[in-house]
């Protein structure tokens, strides 16, 4: 029986991932955790939740022992934009939290660890179009640096200790449920909210900025598909490229204008433009498709329909 701990279960991805995992493995078998951010009512009401700091090894170990955990999914991270404001915090949370996770999993002989990576691992020297699975990794942010180190650490634990460690390089993730927390691609979520609330949006990157993106249902699907894949089919482990769609801000705005004709957008690029410019336009995810059958379901138009519909429901209820 799987006993899964989701670290960072109050975050943008973790808050939705945990609910899907509970529907698959049973509410009591999927434990959520967070440091201080209050999780959603749905997370609290459907299963166990513990507050602790993953940087504190003893606290993480105690929760793993208490619930007899055999799989850890560590979603806790300081993201790219926030990490540039406080790089030492990003290093501490992202690296020490990961090391604690890997060491405890090794000591307790756990079944699996899943730790996501990011397109932030890419940087100058990476091909901008269809960034390959194997390519130059020279990130320009502390977040990206920790993710490169995390990929290498995960692969090291596979080779050195036989621990099953898996990871995938998330593109920008878009969702109408939990707001993102300080990433460079946050504009792709904020634009939908502002379109519904104010019919206008000021974007912090330029209109021709093009980045790989993914809708949350595909993000959850990719994570669980990789988690459930047969280990023997995996040639890669901690660093899978996963793609779904790629679009510029102008194309995103046009997609919204088709549905809200009065919507307008303006541009005031800030420090996040440099980060976005260091990332590729798209990724080559052939390895994920071959090794564990990755296949996304949503494109830009389908996502825009769903985002606007669900955010309008929130707005009409006075929730935003």
Q: What role is predicted for each listed range?
A:
Residues 54-93:
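NAD(P)H-binding glycine-rich loop region in Rossmannoid oxidoreductase-like domains
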Residues 117-118, 151-177:
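Conserved beta-loop-beta element that borders a ligand/cofactor-binding pocket
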Residues 171-180, 190-214:
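A conserved pocket-lining segment of Rossmann-fold NAD(P)-dependent short-chain dehydrogenase/reductase
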Residues 204-206, 211-320:
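C-terminal substrate-binding subdomain of Rossmann-fold SDR/epimerase-dehydratase oxidoreductases
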Residues 148, 161, 173-189, 216-217, ...:
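Glycine/proline-rich active-site loop of Rossmann-fold NAD(P)-dependent oxidoreductases
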Residues 74, 99-142:
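Conserved Rossmann-fold NAD(P)-dependent oxidoreductase catalytic core, especially the SDR/UDP-sugar
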Residues 4-24:
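N-terminal Rossmann NAD(P)H-binding glycine-rich loop of SDR-like oxidoreductase domains
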Residues 123, 138-142, 166-186:
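Flexible, glycine-rich beta-alpha linker
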């Amino acid at each position: 029986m799987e006993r899964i701990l989701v670290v960072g279960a109050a975050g943008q991805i973790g808050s939705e991932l945990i609910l899907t995992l509970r529907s698959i493995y049973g509410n009591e078998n999927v434990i959520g955790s967070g440091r201080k951010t209050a999780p959603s009512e749905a997370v609290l009401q459907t299963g166990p939740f513990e507050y602790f700091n993953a940087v504190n090894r003893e606290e993480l170990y105690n929760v793993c022992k208490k619930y007899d955990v055999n799989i850890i999914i560590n979603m806790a991270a300081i993201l790219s934009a926030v990490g540039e404001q406080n790089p030492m915090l990003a290093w501490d949370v992202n690296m020490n939290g990961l090391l604690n996770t890997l060491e405890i999993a090794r000591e307790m002989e756990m079944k699996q660890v899943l730790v996501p990576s990011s397109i932030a691992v890419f940087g100058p020297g990476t091909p901008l179009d269809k960034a390959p699975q194997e390519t130059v990794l020279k990130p320009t942010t502390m977040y990206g640096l920790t993710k490169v180190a995390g990929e290498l650490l995960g692969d090291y634990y596979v080779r050195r200790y036989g621990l099953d460690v898996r990871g995938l390089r998330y593109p920008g993730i878009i969702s109408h449920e939990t707001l993102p927390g300080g990433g460079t691609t946050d504009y792709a979520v904020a634009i939908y909210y502002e379109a519904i609330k104010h019919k206008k949006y000021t974007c912090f990157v330029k209109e021709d900025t093009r980045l790989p993106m993914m809708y949350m249902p595909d993000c959850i699907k990719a994570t669980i598909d990789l988690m459930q894949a047969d280990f023997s089919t995996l040639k890669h482990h901690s660093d899978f490229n996963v793609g779904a769609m790629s679009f510029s801000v102008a194309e995103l705005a046009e997609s919204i204008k088709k549905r809200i004709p009065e919507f307008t957008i303006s541009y005031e690029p800030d420090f996040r433009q440099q980060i976005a410019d260091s990332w590729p336009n798209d990724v080559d995810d052939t390895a994920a498709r071959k090794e564990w059958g990755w296949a996304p379901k949503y494109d830009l138009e389908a996502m825009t329909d769903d985002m606007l519909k669900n955010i309008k429901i929130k707005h009409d209820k006075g929730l935003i």
